[in-house]
């Protein structure tokens, strides 16, 4: 069962975005009913939006200097409530994007730190291996060559033979390896 690969955060963000639409509808209803919301939150942005929209349309059609009448209070309240609802959905969606970006950045940072730690561990191990190699090379250099060891063995056998057979000379001694 693959639990770690399941995109739980993305599913959570999708759920939040789905909940934002009913939330926006509730905010719109509250804005329509409340005088405070109508007067101070819905009407000014709605009138500004209406003024910019009408002015842009008039300029596109070639009319200059025409006076734009403001919306009546009911239409402005309706437009303001719609703008507030859309802004709520947009803010929730943007917030989800920002949170996903931060989460992704944190994952990337964590991944880079793990890679950096792995590289450092490999560097340390290579350093230890280099020191061990140098020590082994020094031991090999300090050890007598193989030919010298063979000569020492033959001499040792000759000395043993002389000690065991005091009457025989060193030239007649038979090495122990040939017996």
Curated annotation (Swiss-Prot):
Entry keywords, A to Z: Cataract, Coiled coil, Disease variant, Mitochondrion, Sensory transduction, Vision
Which Pfam families does the entry link to? OPA3 (PF07047)
Instruction: State where the protein is found.
Output: Mitochondrion
Q: Which residues form a coiled coil?
A: 103-163
Q: Which GO terms describe its biological process?
A: bone development; fat cell differentiation; mitochondrion organization; neuromuscular process; regulation of growth; regulation of lipid metabolic process; visual perception
The GO cellular component terms are: mitochondrion
Q: In which tissues is it expressed?
A: Ubiquitous. Most prominent expression in skeletal muscle and kidney.
Superkingdom per UniProt: Eukaryota
Q: Which disease is it linked to?
A: 3-methylglutaconic aciduria 3: An autosomal recessive metabolic disorder that causes a neuro-ophthalmologic syndrome consisting of early-onset bilateral optic atrophy, spasticity, extrapyramidal dysfunction and cognitive deficit. Urinary excretion of 3-methylglutaconic acid and 3-methylglutaric acid is increased. MGCA3 can be distinguished from MGCA1 by the absence of increase of 3-hydroxyisovaleric acid levels. Optic atrophy 3: A condition that features progressive visual loss in association with optic atrophy. Atrophy of the optic disk indicates a deficiency in the number of nerve fibers which arise in the retina and converge to form the optic disk, optic nerve, optic chiasm and optic tracts. OPA3 is associated with cataract and a neurologic disorder characterized by extrapyramidal signs and ataxia.
Q: Which family does it belong to?
A: Belongs to the OPA3 family.
Purpose: May play some role in mitochondrial processes.
Specify the protein name: Optic atrophy 3 protein
Q: Which gene encodes it?
A: OPA3
């Amino acid at each position: 069962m693959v639990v770690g690969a399941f995109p739980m955060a993305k599913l959570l963000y999708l759920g939040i975005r789905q909940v934002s639409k009913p939330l926006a509808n509730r905010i719109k209803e509250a804005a329509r009913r409340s005088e405070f919301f109508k007067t101070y939150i819905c009407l000014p942005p709605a009138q500004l939006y209406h003024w910019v929209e009408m002015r842009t349309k008039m300029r596109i059609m070639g009319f200059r200097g025409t006076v734009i009448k403001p919306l009546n209070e009911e239409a402005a309240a309706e437009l303001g409530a719609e703008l507030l609802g859309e802004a709520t959905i947009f803010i929730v969606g943007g917030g989800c994007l920002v949170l996903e970006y931060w989460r992704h950045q944190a994952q990337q940072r964590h991944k880079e730190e793990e890679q950096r730690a792995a590289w450092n561990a490999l560097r340390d191990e290579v350093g230890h291996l280099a020191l061990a190699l140098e020590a082994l090379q020094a031991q090999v250099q300090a050890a007598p060559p193989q030919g010298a060891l063979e000569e020492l063995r033959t001499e040792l056998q000759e000395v043993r033979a002389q000690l065991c057979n005091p009457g025989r000379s060193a030239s007649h001694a038979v090495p122990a390896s040939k017996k």
